[in-house]
């Protein structure tokens, strides 16, 4: 084993996280996430600067940790798969919108679905922006009495309309 030997699972992991961050930020390039021996930490590089993840905003950290956690668990539970796109599963996330800039709230579900196409995401939220970013078939409303409702289409509704009609 040589220090510079590439490990395919690690390379796939880095590529996936990079793709999610590109989707979230609507970038024209793929940022990098990798372990820096020099800093002895996981770092994020946007091409201009390299920063430890702990130096990033809470929103960046939140999406990075969620993405890395999903990818790690998928790799451990499915060692025979070479692509994250092939792996089916169910992932539950509570309050995905926590710490996220409104633009990132809008992009979050799409970015996850694009990068994990065979994963069913069950996401609990109170964010009207996150709700407005969903297509109708993705929404289920459960009230305090556990009554289940399938609200009308909320895609691209204003925040006020989502609060009034959906929540």
Where are these regions (language model features)?
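Short active-site loops of ABC-family nucleotide-binding domains
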Residues: 98-99
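Extended helical coiled-coil dimerization/tether regions that scaffold
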Residues: 1-61, 65-86
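Walker B catalytic acidic pair
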Residues: 94-95
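Hydrophobic "anchor" residues on beta-strands that sit immediately upstream
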Residues: 90-91
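C-terminal lobe/lid and adjacent interdomain/linker elements of RecA-like ASCE P-loop ATPase modules
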Residues: 106-167
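Helix N-cap at the start of a conserved alpha-helix in ABC-type nucleotide-binding domains
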Residues: 102-103
């Amino acid at each position: 084993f040589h220090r510079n030997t590439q490990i395919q699972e690690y390379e796939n992991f880095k590529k996936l996280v990079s793709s999610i961050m590109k989707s979230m930020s609507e970038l024209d390039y793929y940022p990098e996430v990798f372990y820096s021996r020099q800093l002895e930490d996981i770092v994020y590089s946007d091409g201009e600067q390299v920063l430890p993840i702990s130096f990033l905003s809470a929103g960046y950290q939140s999406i990075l940790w969620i993405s890395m956690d999903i990818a790690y668990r998928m790799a451990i539970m499915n060692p025979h798969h070479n692509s994250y796109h092939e792996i089916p599963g169910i992932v539950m996330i509570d309050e995905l919108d926590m710490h996220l800039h409104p633009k990132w709230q809008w992009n979050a579900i799409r970015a996850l679905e694009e990068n994990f196409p065979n994963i069913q995401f069950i996401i609990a939220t109170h964010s009207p922006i996150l709700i407005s970013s969903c297509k109708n078939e993705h929404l289920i409303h459960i009230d305090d009495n556990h009554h289940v409702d399938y609200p009308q289409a909320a895609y691209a509704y204003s925040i006020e309309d989502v609060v009034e009609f959906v929540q």
